[in-house]
Amino acid sequence: MRFRVSLVSLLILAAYAPEGVKAQSAMPAAAANAERDFDIQAGSLDDALSRFGARAGIMVLADTRLTAGRNSPGVRGRYSVDVALVRLLSGTGLQAYRAADGGYRLRLAPSPDGSGVSELEAVEVLGNDPKPADEVYRTAASVNYLSQDDIERFRGTSVGDIFQGIPGVLVGENRNSGGLDINIRGMQGQGRVPVLVDGARQETTVYRGYSGVASRSYVDPDLIGGIEISKGPVAGALGTGATGGVVAMRTINAKDIIKKEDENWGIRVRGSTSGNSSAAPAAGTAGGMFNAGTYRVNCDPAALCGGQYSMPDTYRNDENFDRPGTLDPYSYASSVAGAWRNEKLELVAAVSKRRQGTYFAGKHGKGAEPVITLTDPPPSIYYDTATVTNGGTTRFYTGERVLNSNNESNSQLLKGKLKLSDAQDIELSYLRYHSEYGELMPSQLMWFNKIYQTQNSEVTAQTATLSHHWQPADQSWLDLRTKVWMTHTDSLNRNYASEDQAEAGAESGVAPEPETYRRIGVELGNTSQFEVWGEHTLSYGATFQHEKISTDPSIGALDDAAGREGNRREYSLYMDWHWQPAPEWQINYGLRYQNSRTRDGKLSTDMRYECGKWAMDAQGVESCQQYVAVPTEMCDGVACSYHYKTRNSGTVPVYSISWEPWLNGLQFYARHAEALRMPSLFESTQGWSVQPAPGVPLRPEHTRNREFGLNLLTNDVLRSNDRLAFKAAYFRNKTNDYLTRTSPNEWENLQQDFVMRNIRSVKLRGFEATLDYDAGRVYTRLSGTRYNFIEVCHEGSYRRDDCNNYGVAASYFNDMIPPKWHASVLLGTRWLDGKLDLGARLTLMGKRNPTPAFNDDTKRAFNWPTLWQDYKVVDIYARYQYSEAVSVDFNIDNLTDRYYVDPLSLGMVPAPGRTARLGLTLNF
């Protein structure tokens, strides 16, 4: 068995030279002779090789048949890599030798009788980036990684379910549209948490009625090869504007499909089917609890109880309760991916199709329930009155079909990578995603008499990237990466305009909201490595992004004033310096400069107020209407009308220090990170939901994140070759000048219902921890987050207190506040030589901070916070690896069929009930 992995550099770093800095040698042997300090303790050979690789700049991979059960004496002192490796393998029965390609190989040492080495195949030892799952516990920051196996293990019903169980990470409005709106430690939307696909940003903003907006990014999990999650501001090319963190997704490549190193092609076929769903009903189908109100009863004469006063016979639509059996499937997902490669070229092509029907809510919990209360005393001697109210958590009943939870998508992926030389390669990728889905408007859930199935909304998202990488083997100062990317998103959201039109189910009964969002980005960065008083890695570069939004008012019934038009451009310069003065210490310092401009494509008009403030109307006639919009050309030389613009810039640092006192995997760190988020294109243009106001300039958000944590990664704790990983952090996040929607203040004399502005601050503090233990036969993962302080501050009219922990009137932040705590417990076991993997996960979710019974500031506007309840959900899974080519997966999500509402839901939408899923993967 052979393991071959790519390398940022297959050479070992250049040696320290007293007279200055030396470049990496073109001859690996010369670099290998350079001396460096090693301090690797005795213990498991696997662990010792891993630590040796991290110190020497290589990753040692070996067949477990060679290393299993062997221990290393370790190595301490200053040695060349060759000598250190010999000492590390002393007494293990293994030896290393250099191959012609400059790499290392391990083999069994010759026996004392000279009979030669074992017939086991030699194993290549090449440099490589460390395993992402292990790097989580070596990084002086809060990070997480999702592998393909993690994504497949808990696929869930909605795309956002793959993030369940990650501490500090939630998904807003997870049951709507198939899009992703990631929340990291309370930061969400408008670029606070960029979701990147192969480095490209795709986020769009979607109107959610009185409840505000949602930010959405679209991708099919079958086409994702891995996900890296960074929490807090990030230094580097990907971190521009990321006040909450970054979610970086990598699409599948040839190595994900071609499983054997000596093969040059491969095909992966994957399919799954799931139950607890049915076909979407016809547009206009009613659901949920309806007919709440006050009616007459016990009438004398009986005619007084007729017509509109008659008590309804039903409060639900019985058609929505024909729930299929647990093992009766309707929804499905399928994908085919193929790859081909040779020494110069890699090609990947994949297609994916997914159909999610309207799912059914769980049966156990507090669903909708009509509560009838008689008026006491009776209002009349001729009749009594009875008031019907909903006594449940949401307007959907337990076990009911959740209207508009349907989603169908098609995706295509094309990738090619060309190796121009040993030092250069170029890669091109194209991803297309198209979806049609039901749109559940929060206003229907809160205020309409009935909830209706809408006509499907649509979105098409296209992403293209072109990247070039140049890294000469003999130039340690040159590791140049260039990328150009583009995203183009067309969306058409259909929402009912009225109940009468909804019942008709006709095209005239919807108000389409078409939007086109384009982004173009450029990245240029270089990494230099050198040794002066320790090892240094310096990354630096620039990024640029241009955005444009436009709307087509000719489609449907959309009012031209509601759509948005505008453009935005932003560039940043960054530097990230890593210094390791000694094996125990690592110091990082980063700096980012940003510059941003936006321009509203629509003409804003100054509104003149009431009589006494005469103004000219569009025809130039003086008028005393209450509100008079005055175009510039009709204002007698006074600029009463304009295109709203913003221009902002600033510089922020990121720095950290880590200490590994015993070089045994236990690391302590402290980190201070800042980020600026410039006003987004949505925030600085006028249209639905909110618009900027004259005299209220928009400033950048400024986030400061302080974090203190520890990492532990070790082996042989409770038994030989087990693995223990632990990560814990205390964080203090403060965002000054937080941008959000608010109500206008009395002293501002603004004639708008809502105003986009900077409020004073948002603060979140808390603890986060993850424990990961794997003993082979059994494994477990425990993780959780607890917030001990949440505060939002704003000085405004009618506010009793400037600061509270539950929200601000009209603010989008109200539905971004995370629960005070959430946790996850995973237990698993492997059988049949690891072919059978069984496990269960318990998810525990706390409540949202409650709003006060009196003086609730959020009640002054429409978007009252969604107050979900705490819940516990159990998911189980099984995977059987029949052969290298065939694997079968079986899952049951929400095993106990709980009725619950996900956190950060803009409307009270219940999650899916018990759902069984069966999947099959074939590799050729």
Regions picked out by a protein language model, each given a short descriptive name:
Residues Q202-K231:
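Short acidic/polar hinge/loop motifs at secondary-structure boundaries
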Residues S528, Q580-I587, Q594-S596, L718, ...:
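Gram-negative outer-membrane beta-barrel transporters
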